[in-house]
Amino acid sequence: GVLEIVGLFSDSRVIGVCDVDYDTGTPSPQILYYDYSCLEMMLISSDSAFTPFFHTYYRGKAGFAEIRLKLLQELKWLSCYRKLNSICGWGICFNGLSMKKAFEAETQNINTAKIISQIRELNPSFTEHIRRQVDQVHKECIKNDGLPELLSITQGHDFLDYFREICSTTWS
């Protein structure tokens, strides 16, 4: 990754910029990390950066802060699962997970049962492990309540995919 690339250079002026994701290692003085988990979440956290983006695509009645918080809260379960997967080394594959398949247009919510079903489909050899992990994820969700915590654990791509689904219902 970025740390290895920076390590190839003997010049201390060479820096790398990368996502924090769920990295808990010792930071390098030559690595700059984005606030929160990734560049997308850093921009989403900033009212001045998110507001113009929000107003370009969203046509509903709610304000940007209300929608941002709703999305973060709805994604909390998935975000906690991703976090625990990274920290505990569970090896769960999330590639191919679809917000569209988990999105319920009537309520504009994410159906967690549909997320779990997709995770099982993407990881057929981990079925029993997933059942146990789901309980741990529920416990982890209790700890991550405030806006800063939600911004720190949420993946930007999940947020943007969910935002796209919400916007698609407000354009109708």
Mark where each language-model region is.
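Acidic, divalent-metal-binding catalytic cores of TOPRIM
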Residues: 1-172
